[in-house]
Each structure stands twice: as structure tokens, then as C-alpha cells.
């Protein structure tokens, strides 16, 4: 472990801010003579915080900035760049103070803020002292004082990220901070409730009850890893980072020991530039690698390695634990020699399968999805594979291939809500079992009682290096922690029963399931699941002619939020879809998209046949409204990728679902880049994204999503329906929207035949493991400019296939509020049911033969005619009345209810434009 000591030299430069009277003697005493200090869990009572103290701290920060601006210092403008960090910290503190103007007492009483300000004062004073003591050595780039300055810069970086995470937009939200890993979140909730920050000793004792800590030396090493801000406290933010780095929770400390304590490739508190400098020694030994915590994307690892052609690259693994990334990289020849050593640790022992998180569905939910011709387990993006992965912390579910494709297309955040993807968990959705209770089976065990190791003497800068070395030398392989308790969660969210329309009262929506599980096999497609009688086949009219290219313009957006019911029919939640006669299909686009060349499907394309129409990014118009387009690989659009929905279907519905709004165009651009991407980058380790030479912005994992885009213009809703979420709002949904689509599409359909089916659908899909830059210009929250894409005609058979996922996306996880100002849609868009495969194929065949059924072919009876006239006199359009009657099977009372529920008479958007 000599390499560990050498590589981390000076890593403790930030220390805890004190003089460290005990030093190594104190560390050894703590390791071998654990004693009991219950009397004072807090290391020291925090000072009083007022505006005067904050301003004093600002003066110290200003002094540090002036010292660092000395030209002789010649600081590199690469993260962590202290000349950016301190001004950013100052600016965010100003924002916090402005939010608490007149309420400074409230802010001063906030425990986290007091601890933060005290630590900021200490670290700025420590930096000033470093300049005084280091003198001329500060100007030597490789000197110890200069290394300590770099360490302090990292600490300032961590502090700023933490401050932004706990005070997003300047408002305290530490008590609602969302811990990414469900098991870790449950531990924190049980141990500390809604506390934002706890003393290290309290944290250590609570953690020991779940993950036994073998010695005081191990406790000290653990503290040096988890206490990113070096203040003797552990915040919920730091805990979230640690549990993401060393996932899974069930073997947390075992993973930490294998990756941070004993692994020669681990680098504590190293920067991007320092990793490059270190690997330069092994430039002629391809496969040499080291890894560190990413300072700009806290909670993720950055792996630096030497390529076969003598380059040094740094990558960030995606959607997998570090040990899995290292194993995969070793197998593929990328990560062979940790820190240049010939012996590479075997990490396969960490790959023990975790207990599967089985999501079970109740009988009612099963029947509801059958009514829609779908199943809960079907991925609502591709409508082909079963869901097998859960995005954290938002909780949305999808299949791995869709998530991978989305990320490779440079999609930002979660495809559904744009919340930052802090982690993923494999899940399994079980088919309905009539004998099951529908509840989740959890398992767990209690750990040993907590020892009370004391570690008061941990303040000296480099003691942690000695401690890590000693711990590594004596470390034996530890068993996995018995604790694998996942939080209790209710059942997956589903829409309401249509047959309960009249008698059902509002009920709270159930939540998305959180927890860990092994990956599901995604090819079965519920062939072993008994289904009730499938829905009646509803045939779609023939597709539009394939002879004209689709034109994209910049028409004015309609004033209503469209429903995600069909690719081209997206009316408001509160209104039945109108039947426009001339509105082109691009009127829903938020901004013009450049025309793209026509291409033909490539039969060998791996995505040939994949229904990327169901990616739901671009709301299209009805086929009857669309200009026919050339038959090219089509790019679909699921509206819910752009429209955050407000169904209370997950644990964060409510106060925590105030995610920022996203422009549809950002999703469109990401999906476009998926459909027509440039040639893939040189092959790099799979599932990883790279780092550029310099990170220029600081990511801030927070309780809110990071993907903040400019909100799209909202369409006001004149209807004053209440914002009921989930069940009550969808009582007509389960069978409604396909019928609505059929009527509307037939109203103006053309009688051309066209080849249909999934075989003619293809999108370019890039290969395994591209690496993106860790340059923060490419961060999660900045959408890429649109990549020219291949747009294709959507045949009506495609639309029947696409219906599998339109609108049901938000049933798969976390909803979010899509609100701003006075133009907030009062309800989320209505979903559109999908067809089961048999129905889809039958419909496809019938379309090929040009045979369609017309549900409104017969003329209404005289009684119906009089009712229709009466409704028209009230302001309803004839098309809306006809659609409502078909949906209600000519039940005039139900049709009236539908009209009242969905149609706003006064809305100007009700008239086709």
C-alpha cells in the first residue's frame, strides 16, 4: 500500500480546520482503545450566524481570491478553480440572504447553515494561513503547500455543490432532499428523520448498527472518504454522494474497502490535471489506470487510463457501480494496471446478486392494463421490452435498451421528467399472480450494537493517509452487510377503471416502487401471463400517401396543451380533440427543425423495427392533418417526454414534484440525434462517458432536477377544472382515446394503402460504450444543439403501435408539476391506450387491405339529433359531440358528462386554426 500513501500525499490538506493536537498517537489510541464519549456528540457547538458574520466571511473570501490572483501563482483554469469557486459561493450566499430578507433569525437558526458558515470561515482562514506559511513555496507547482491549496480548492468545490444542493435557488430544502438510493434513503429517514446534517459520531454509530465498522481506524478512514467538506459533520448531501459512489447499499462498506482502502488505483482528492500528470509516468504502459471522485459530477467516478495509442483519457461510468465498470474494462483490455502495477485486484467477489426488487401488480391493476390492451411491465417507450431498470431518484421505469439509447443520443436527465439521473437500479415486474397479495416482499436483518469509537484526534492534515495505509495493510475481506432492507413502497400506479366511472370517489394514487433488484429478462413480453378477452379490434383508416416529404415550419403554437393520445392528436386535458381541417403537423413543435434528407431503412440496422415513435418527444398532428411525408425511417414522439405530468403516482408527488419545465425542443433534439447520429466515436469502455480536458462548470446534485431548460410557452386553459391527479382524472381514459383517435382520423382520412408494420421502422443506433466529455459544458442540464435527423412518415399502423405507450408514461414512475405563472395546465395530458400485439397485427393486416371499420357510419336517431342540436346551441362543436357519443356508445347522458369534462366551450383553441 505504499502507492496509496504516495498517491494521496497531501490529500488531507483541508483537514478539519484545527491544529490536530493528538496526531498519530490519537489515531492509534482510537484504533486500539475505543472509548465511550456520549457526553457531547457534536464536535463543537456552532457559532451564531447573522448578517455581520456572513459579511465578515465574504471579506475573508475576497482576501483569498486576491492571494490566488497573484500572477506568480499561475493557477490553471481547470476544476477545481478557486477563482471561480469562491465568487460562485459568494453569489449563492447573496441569493440565500435575499431569500431570507427580514427572516435572518430563521436562517441563523438553521443548523446546516450555521455549520456551513462556520466551516467556510475556517477554510478561508486556513487558506490565508497557508499562503503565510508557505511563502515562496506556494509558487512552486509541485510543492506540498501548493498541493494543500489544491485540496482546499476541492473542499471549496464540495462545499459549493452541497450549498446548492441544500439551498437550491436560495431556499432551504435540506429536509426534503431526495437521497438517490432507496435503501440509503430509508436508513437516513429511520436514523435521523428529516435532519439535514448530523455530527460524525452520531452518523458513525447509526451506520455501525447496519454496516458494522470493525475498528476505530476503519472509522477514521471512512470519515476521510465521506466527509467531503471536512467539518466533522455528515450532511444528507454527503451521505447521498457516498452511497452512490459505493453502491449497492447491501454491501456498502465491503465495496468501500475493496475500492477505496485496498485498491491501488484509488486516488483520494485528486483533480483532473493531477490524474493526467500521474498517468504520464505510465504513458508507455497502455491499460494503466487510476480512478477518483469526479469533482464536477459529485457522486460519480472518473476513471483515467492510458490508451493503446498513448493517449490519456478520463471517463465516467454510466448506470453501473464502479466495480462493474472496472471488471468490464479489464475484460475489454482498458483497465489492466492500477497505478501502473502489474497486479490488478479481482473485484468479481463484489458482483454477488442483490435480492430482486419484485414489483407486483394487483388484480384490479392487471385488469385495467388488460382493458387498455397492455401490461404494466411493458416499457412505455419502446412498447417491446419489459421494464427492467429504475431511474433514481425520480423513480421512472423503462427498459435498459431505451435508457442506453437515450443516453447515447445525448439526452439530458430522465427521458420522462428530465430530473438528473443520479443512479439506476435493476427491477423486475412480475406478471399478475392471483394467489399473491400484490405487496412487496422485503427482507433485512439487524446488525450488531454500535461501538463508540472516539476519533477526536483526526484533525491533522495527513493523518488520514497514515490511517488509510495502516487500515489497508491489515484489511481482510469483509462479508457483505446483512442489511438489505428496502423502504416500504406501495404498488405501481395505474389508471382508473372505466366501469367505475360513476361510482368511484377520488383515491390517492399509489407510488412507484423503489428498491434494488436484479436485472429482468426483457424478451418475454408477457407470453406467460393470462389475459382476459382482449379489447374489441378498432381498425384505423389507411395511412396517408407516401409521396410528399414532411415539411417543418414555425407556425404559431396552439393555445392549448395537447393530449398525448396520438402522434398527431394532442388536445387539452379538459377538451375533446378538435378536428382541424388545415393545421399542419408541425404546429405543435416549439421551434423549427431543419429539414433533413430522406433515407431508407437499413435492414441491418440494430434498431430496425424498434418503435422509436414511442419515444414521444415530438407531438405530431393527426394523420389527416399532417402533410404526407416520404416513407423514411421515422422518428416518433411521446409527448410525455416533454410534458411533466401531475399524476400522484410516486413518493415525490406533491411538494417534491416541482421540477422545472423543459422545452419540447430539447427532447426533440435529443431524439433527433438518436435517429440520425454521426459516426460513433472510437470504441471506449462500455456504458461510460468520458471527460474532456477541462471541466468548466460545477454540477450540483440536488433535491431538484438539474435539467433546467427555458420553459416552453404555455397554452392557458379556460376550463376551470380542478387539478385532480391520477385516478379521478382518468376515469374515462382507459377506453376513450383510441376511439377518439379513430373518429378524428377517419373524419379527414384518405383512402390510400400503404405498407405498414414495425419492419419498416428504423433509426440509427450507435454502438456500445461511447464516451462523452466530463466537460461541464456537456453537463446534464444543458441540451445539445439539434443533430440533423431523419424524419419519416408515420403510417397509421405505426400509430396503432405507438398507441402502446402514448400517455401512459407517467404511470411508470415519478410525476412532476409542469407549472409556471398563470399558464399552468390545470391537468396533465390524457393518456392514450395501446393495443396488445394480436390486435396490433390484425389492425396492420386490415390496413394493408384497405378494410376499415367506421364507428360513426350510421346516422344518429331523431332523438339523438335533437340532443345534438341542443348541445350545439350550447356552444359545443358537432365533431366534439360526435366523438363523445361514440365514446359513450350513444349514451347521451354520458356524452354530456364527457363534453363537460373535456370540452371548454369558450376556448378559442377549440376552433381549428
UniProtKB/Swiss-Prot annotation:
Domain of life of the source: Eukaryota
Ranges where the record places region Interaction with CD2AP: 646-913
Effect on the protein upon substituting residue 304 to E: Abolishes interaction with ZAP70, but does not affect interaction with SLA
Presence of keyword Lipoprotein: no
Stretches assigned to the UBA domain: 863-902
Additional notes on this entry: This protein has one functional calcium-binding site.
Residue ranges, annotated region (Disordered): 430-460, 476-613, 647-727, 750-787, 814-863
Catalysed transformations (reactions): S-ubiquitinyl-[E2 ubiquitin-conjugating enzyme]-L-cysteine + [acceptor protein]-L-lysine = [E2 ubiquitin-conjugating enzyme]-L-cysteine + N(6)-ubiquitinyl-[acceptor protein]-L-lysine
Protein's UniProt name: E3 ubiquitin-protein ligase CBL
A single GO molecular function term of this UniProt record: SH3 domain binding
A GO CC term assigned to this protein in UniProt: cilium
Stretch list, region EF-hand-like: 174-246
Ligand binding (Ca(2+)): 227, 229, 231, 233, 238
E.C. designation(s): 2.3.2.27
Domain Cbl-PTB: 45-349
Residues bound to 4-O-phospho-L-tyrosine: 292
Source species of the chain: Mus musculus
The encoding gene: Cbl
Function comment: E3 ubiquitin-protein ligase that acts as a negative regulator of many signaling pathways by mediating ubiquitination of cell surface receptors. Accepts ubiquitin from specific E2 ubiquitin-conjugating enzymes, and then transfers it to substrates promoting their degradation by the proteasome. Recognizes activated receptor tyrosine kinases, including KIT, FLT1, FGFR1, FGFR2, PDGFRA, PDGFRB, CSF1R, EPHA8 and KDR and mediates their ubiquitination to terminate signaling. Recognizes membrane-bound HCK, SRC and other kinases of the SRC family and mediates their ubiquitination and degradation.
Modified residues (Phosphotyrosine): 369, 672, 698, 737, 780
Keywords: Calcium, Cell membrane, Cell projection, Cytoplasm, Golgi apparatus, Membrane, Metal-binding, Phosphoprotein, Proto-oncogene, Repeat, Transferase, Ubl conjugation, Ubl conjugation pathway, Zinc, Zinc-finger
Post-translational note: Phosphorylated on tyrosine residues by ALK, EGFR, FGR, INSR, SYK, FYN and ZAP70. Phosphorylated on several tyrosine residues by constitutively activated FGFR3. Phosphorylated on tyrosine residues by activated PDGFRA and PDGFRB. Phosphorylated on tyrosine residues in response to CSF1R, FLT1 and KIT signaling. Phosphorylated on tyrosine residues by HCK.
Biased composition range(s): Pro residues: 531-548
Transmembrane segments: none
Phosphoserine modification, residue list: 437, 450, 481, 617, 640, 666-667, 692, 907
Amino acid at each position: 500500500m505504499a502507492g496509496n500513501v504516495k498517491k494521496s500525499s497531501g490529500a488531507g490538506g483541508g483537514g478539519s480546520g484545527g491544529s490536530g493536537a493528538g496526531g498519530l498517537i490519537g489515531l492509534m489510541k482510537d484504533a486500539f482503545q475505543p472509548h465511550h464519549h456520549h457526553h457531547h456528540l457534536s464536535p463543537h457547538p456552532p457559532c451564531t450566524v447573522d448578517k455581520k458574520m456572513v459579511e465578515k466571511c465574504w471579506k475573508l473570501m475576497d482576501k483569498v481570491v486576491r492571494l490566488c490572483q497573484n500572477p506568480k501563482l499561475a493557477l490553471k483554469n481547470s476544476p477545481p478553480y478557486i477563482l471561480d469557486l469562491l465568487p460562485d459561493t459568494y453569489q449563492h450566499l447573496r441569493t440565500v440572504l435575499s431569500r431570507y430578507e427580514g427572516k435572518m433569525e430563521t436562517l441563523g437558526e438553521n443548523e446546516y447553515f450555521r455549520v456551513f458558515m462556520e466551516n467556510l470561515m475556517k477554510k478561508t482562514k486556513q487558506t490565508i494561513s497557508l499562503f503565510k506559511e508557505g511563502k515562496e513555496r506556494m509558487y512552486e507547482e509541485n510543492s506540498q503547500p501548493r498541493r494543500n491549496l489544491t485540496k482546499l480548492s476541492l473542499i471549496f468545490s464540495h462545499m459549493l455543490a452541497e450549498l446548492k444542493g441544500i439551498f437550491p435557488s436560495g431556499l432551504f430544502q435540506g429536509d426534503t432532499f431526495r437521497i438517490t438510493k432507496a435503501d440509503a434513503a430509508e436508513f437516513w429517514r429511520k436514523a435521523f428523520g428529516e435532519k439535514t446534517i448530523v455530527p460524525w459520531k452520531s452518523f458513525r454509530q447509526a451506520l455501525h448498527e447496519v454496516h458494522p465498522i470493525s475498528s476505530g481506524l476503519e472509522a477514521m478512514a471512512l470519515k476521510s472518504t465521506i466527509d467531503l467538506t471536512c467539518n466533522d459533520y455528515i450532511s444528507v448531501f454527503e451521505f447521498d454522494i457516498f452511497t452512490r459512489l459505493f453502491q449497492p447499499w447491501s454491501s456498502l462498506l465491503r465495496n468501500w474497502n475493496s475500492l477505496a482502502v485496498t485498491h491501488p488505483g484509488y486516488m483520494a482528492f485528486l483533480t483532473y490535471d493531477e490524474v493526467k500528470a500521474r498517468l504520464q509516468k505510465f504513458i508507455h504502459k497502455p491499460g494503466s489506470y487510476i480512478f477518483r471522485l469526479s469533482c464536477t459530477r459529485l457522486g460519480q467516478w472518473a476513471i483515467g487510463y492510458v490508451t493503446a495509442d498513448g493517449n490519456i483519457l478520463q471517463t465516467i461510468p454510466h448506470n453501473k457501480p464502479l466495480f462493474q465498470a472496472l471488471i468490464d474494462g479489464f475484460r475489454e483490455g482498458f483497465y489492466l494496471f492500477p497505478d501502473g502495477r502489474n497486479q490488478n485486484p479481482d473485484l468479481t467477489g463484489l458482483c454477488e446478486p442483490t435480492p430482486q426488487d419484485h414489483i407486483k401488480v394487483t388484480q384490479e391493476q392487471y385488469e385495467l392494463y388488460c382493458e387498455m390492451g397492455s401490461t404494466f411491465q411493458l416499457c412505455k417507450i419502446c412498447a417491446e421490452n419489459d421494464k427492467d431498470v429504475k431511474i433514481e431518484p425520480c423513480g421512472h421505469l423503462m427498459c435498459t435498451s431505451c435508457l442506453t439509447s437515450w443516453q447515447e443520443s445525448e439526452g439530458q436527465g430522465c427521458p420522462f421528467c428530465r430530473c438528473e439521473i443520479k443512479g439506476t437500479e435493476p427491477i423486475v415486474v412480475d406478471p399478475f399472480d392471483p394467489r399473491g397479495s400484490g405487496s412487496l416482499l422485503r427482507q433485512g436483518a439487524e446488525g450488531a450494537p454500535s461501538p463508540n469509537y472516539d476519533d477526536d484526534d483526526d484533525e491533522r492534515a495527513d493523518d488520514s493517509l497514515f490511517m488509510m495505509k495502516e487500515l489497508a495493510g491489515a484489511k481482510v475481506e469483509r462479508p457483505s452487510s446483512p442489511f438489505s432492507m428496502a423502504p416500504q413502497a406501495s404498488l405501481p400506479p395505474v389508471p382508473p377503471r372505466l366501469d367505475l366511472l360513476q361510482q368511484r370517489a377520488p383515491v390517492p394514487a399509489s407510488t412507484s416502487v423503489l428498491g434494488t433488484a436484479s436485472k429482468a429478462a426483457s424478451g418475454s413480453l408477457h407470453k406467460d401471463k393470462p389475459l382476459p378477452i382482449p379489447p374489441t379490434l378498432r381498425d384505423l383508416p389507411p395511412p396517408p400517401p407516401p409521396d410528399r416529404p414532411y415539411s417543418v415550419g414555425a407556425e404559431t403554437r396552439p393555445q392549448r396543451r395537447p393530449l398525448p393520445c396520438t402522434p398527431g392528436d394532442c388536445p387539452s386535458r379538459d377538451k375533446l380533440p378538435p378536428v382541424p381541417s388545415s393545421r399542419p403537423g408541425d404546429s405543435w413543435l416549439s421551434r423549427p427543425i431543419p429539414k433533413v434528407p430522406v433515407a431508407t431503412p437499413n435492414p441491418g440496422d440494430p434498431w430496425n423495427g424498434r418503435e422509436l415513435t414511442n419515444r414521444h418527444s415530438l407531438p405530431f398532428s393527426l394523420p389527416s392533418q399532417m402533410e404526407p411525408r416520404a416513407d423514411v425511417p421515422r422518428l416518433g414522439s411521446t409527448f410525455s417526454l416533454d410534458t411533466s405530468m401531475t399524476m400522484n403516482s410516486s413518493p415525490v408527488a406533491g411538494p417534491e414534484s416541482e421540477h422545472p419545465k423543459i422545452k419540447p425542443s430539447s427532447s426533440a433534439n435529443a431524439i433527433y440525434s438518436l435517429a440520425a447520429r454521426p459516426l460513433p466515436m472510437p470504441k471506449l469502455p462500455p456504458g461510460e462517458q468520458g471527460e474532456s480536458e477541462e471541466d468548466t462548470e460545477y454540477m450540483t446534485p440536488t433535491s431538484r432536477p438539474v435539467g433546467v431548460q427555458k420553459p416552453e410557452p404555455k397554452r392557458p386553459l379556460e376550463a376551470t377544472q380542478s387539478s385532480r391527479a391520477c385516478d379521478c382524472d382518468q376515469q374515462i381514459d382507459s377506453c376513450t382515446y383510441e376511439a377518439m383517435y379513430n373518429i378524428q382520423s377517419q373524419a379527414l382520412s384518405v383512402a390510400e394503402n400503404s405498407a405498414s408494420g414495425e419492419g419498416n421502422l428504423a433509426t440509427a443506433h450507435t454502438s456500445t460504450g461511447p464516451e462523452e466529455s466530463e466537460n461541464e459544458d456537456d453537463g446534464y442540464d444543458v441540451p445539445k444543439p439539434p443533430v440533423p435527423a431523419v424524419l419519416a412518415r408515420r403510417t397509421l399502423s405505426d400509430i396503432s403501435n405507438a398507441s402502446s405507450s402514448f400517455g401512459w408514461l407517467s404511470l411508470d414512475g415519478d410525476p412532476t408539476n409542469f407549472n409556471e405563472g398563470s399558464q399552468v395546465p390545470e391537468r396533465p395530458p390524457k393518456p392514450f391506450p395501446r393495443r396488445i400485439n394480436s390486435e396490433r397485427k390484425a389492425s396492420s393486416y386490415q390496413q394493408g387491405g384497405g378494410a376499415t371499420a367506421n364507428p360513426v357510419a350510421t346516422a344518429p336517431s331523431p332523438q339523438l339529433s335533437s340532443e345534438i342540436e341542443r348541445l350545439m346551441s350550447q356552444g359545443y362543436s358537432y365533431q366534439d359531440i360526435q366523438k363523445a357519443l361514440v365514446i359513450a356508445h350513444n349514451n347521451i347522458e354520458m356524452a354530456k358528462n364527457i363534453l363537460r369534462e373535456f370540452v371548454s366551450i369558450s376556448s378559442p383553441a377549440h376552433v381549428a386554426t
